[in-house]
């Protein structure tokens, strides 16, 4: 919020790549954990700032599609990382994956010289001439590629003046406080279930149902592949359906197959796969689009901060998921785990239904003054 989107992106990518290189030369578990922790700082800085940047460059009418097709690359990258690790690690060792992790450093130079700073951030900092140059450059590029520029829509007059970077205190003010709590509930609930399922189901297939390793891995790849298709459908339709309606429907829908697993006893691997997969896919459309919604519910001065603090609840939910699984399974049965996840999905869906504002088709300044 203080020095700009692109400088922070360059720094974060540099930290990530440098710590990838350091991990190659780790001399023990403690040093590897320390380097991975520092690498996580790079990732944690890059993702919310990049999401704010893309949000601020998106037009109101198709912002959801534009942003989520960008976010889809993240899911493709996760799938590709698993495939690359499967192929490389047995032959080249675990260090080879950190060599791959150094590749993003190649983005730093083009990032600084071929991309423009967010015009919304420039305006917010009072750098109007620079913002005008960026906007003119974008308009000229669109015209060169044969695109027609839509007529500007009339909006209420807004006094444009430089504003200081936002603060955590403002995030809990009268306007943004309820939005902050809503987003934190969504981040926590959706990621608690999805990351819980993602990490637990392969172990479940192996230890409870005694499936061969290759079959358990195959179930996992199939589940993530179906979730990838669901995410693409979400990207193409969320602007028409609307954020509030999509999130409510996805969360409440996910609770149905999860609760069905409890009722039926989750007694076979086919049953678990057939019912957990649609729930996971529905929730995946929520988790991967929350950076979009977070960026829409905060103004420019709070956008990166809000997304960053919101994603901290992503980590909290991801930690809570396996812990809840262990706690609930202490009775010896796996079925109550699915009931617990169903209850969390339903409760989060009702929270969204009651308190989530609709943002589709509206300019960011209209949504968050």
Can you say where each PLM-predicted feature lies in the sequence?
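Transmembrane-helix signature of 12-pass secondary carriers
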Residues: 1-369
């Amino acid at each position: 919020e203080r020095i700009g989107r692109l400088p922070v992106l360059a720094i974060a990518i540099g930290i990530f790549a440098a710590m990838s290189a350091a991990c190659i030369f780790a001399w023990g578990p403690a040093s590897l954990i320390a380097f991975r922790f520092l690498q996580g700082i790079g990732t944690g800085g890059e993702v919310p700032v990049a999401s704010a940047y893309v949000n601020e460059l998106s037009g109101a009418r198709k912002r959801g599609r534009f942003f989520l097709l960008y976010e889809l690359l993240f899911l493709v990258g996760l799938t590709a990382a698993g495939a690359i690790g499967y192929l490389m690690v047995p032959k080249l060792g675990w260090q080879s994956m950190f060599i791959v992790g150094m590749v993003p450093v190649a983005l730093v130079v083009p990032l600084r010289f071929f991309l423009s700073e967010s015009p919304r951030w420039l305006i917010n900092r009072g750098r109007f001439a620079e913002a005008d140059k960026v906007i003119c450059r974008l308009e000229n590029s669109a015209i060169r590629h044969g695109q027609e520029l839509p007529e500007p829509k009339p909006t209420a007059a807004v006094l444009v003046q430089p504003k200081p970077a936002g603060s955590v205190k403002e995030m809990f003010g009268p306007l943004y406080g309820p939005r902050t709590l809503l987003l934190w509930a969504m981040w926590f609930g959706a990621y608690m279930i999805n990351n819980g399922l993602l990490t637990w189901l392969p172990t479940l297939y192996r230890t409870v149902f005694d499936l061969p390793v290759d079959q358990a891995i195959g179930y996992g790849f199939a589940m993530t592949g179906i979730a990838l298709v669901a995410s693409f459908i979400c990207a193409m339709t969320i602007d028409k359906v609307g954020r509030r309606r999509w999130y409510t429907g996805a969360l409440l829908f996910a609770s149905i197959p999860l609760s069905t697993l409890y009722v039926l006893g989750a007694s076979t691997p086919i049953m678990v796969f057939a019912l957990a997969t649609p729930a996971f896919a529905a929730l995946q459309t929520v988790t991967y689009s929350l950076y979009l919604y977070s960026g829409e519910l905060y103004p420019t001065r709070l956008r990166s901060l809000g997304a960053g603090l919101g994603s901290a609840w992503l980590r909290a939910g991801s930690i809570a998921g396996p812990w809840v699984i262990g706690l609930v399974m202490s009775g010896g049965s796996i079925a109550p785990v699915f009931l617990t996840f169903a209850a969390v999905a339903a409760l989060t869906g009702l929270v969204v239904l009651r308190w989530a504002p609709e943002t589709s088709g509206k300019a960011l300044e209209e949504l968050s003054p």
